């Protein structure tokens, strides 16, 4: 079962929903980087369950522990192991899933592929796998911010038929997004979304939606042509998130409604800075699979949570038709907790692209990167 990703900044996650622990091994992190444990914990706190009555009531502290790769608060170049203990499992609620498949869940496909599965909590298909990715991405975020000034901010753009009305007035910080529990910067829409989620929760049902994400201060040159396009890497990473079913960059599918003359992003030279800019950003910051220096703009679609508390038709292990009323603790809508997960996988893709570009083109690094003091402190 593949569980690793990355060319330079390599991430390998481990653990299941109801196992003893979940975590991640991170390779390729340069030595000498200060690891701010409180920043990693802050990111994990944003994705943890039990944050509000909009999320699953499973109450986990998700306290991270650094097992290796860090000495006196700094990376030493060896693999970094980050571990979070599972403390609030309730496996008896899943006993009926030992022999019965949840519709639209990974239960059936895992059974068909492997012939055996961990039925409690969804096992490896659980969103708790993303704890490792969020923890690793906190390190990635530190590197991107310190070296390039890159900031990635995601938010809930829609839930059900309720659409945020902020347009291209994108939030500049995660603090703006976190002002409400829905994580939608449009306060009016957020209230409507909250009511819809609670309505679905009361009905034992679920609802999906979309998340938008912007990365600021990307330099031109990240990503590679053809098979290693940055948008291709982003698509694979984002679609690997549980419940994510759609992805677009820039104008995305709506761009098909435009003509070339209205869709093309015309270049100009910015007065005062001399920077090459584009008048519009329908490309979403990517052209030919490579960043062009504009904001990276993506959107991801999440289906309604598959585990619901309504009676549904399904089959059992014997292939017999039956019905299922699910138990356990589940999110009526994954969107509020998926926001930090989207930010995480975007940062993982970007840091891998950055470290690769830095390795193959030192002149690019000298031109675009800021050299933090901790690199200068290395005794070589």
Swiss-Prot record:
BP GO terms, sorted: amino acid biosynthetic process; aromatic amino acid family biosynthetic process; chorismate biosynthetic process
Listed SUPFAM superfamilies: Chorismate synthase, AroC
Keywords: Amino-acid biosynthesis, Aromatic amino acid biosynthesis, FAD, Flavoprotein, FMN, Lyase, NADP
Enzyme's top EC category: lyase
Source superkingdom: Bacteria
Family: Belongs to the chorismate synthase family.
Descriptive protein name: Chorismate synthase
Source species: Leptospira borgpetersenii serovar Hardjo-bovis (strain JB197)
Gene (UniProt): aroC
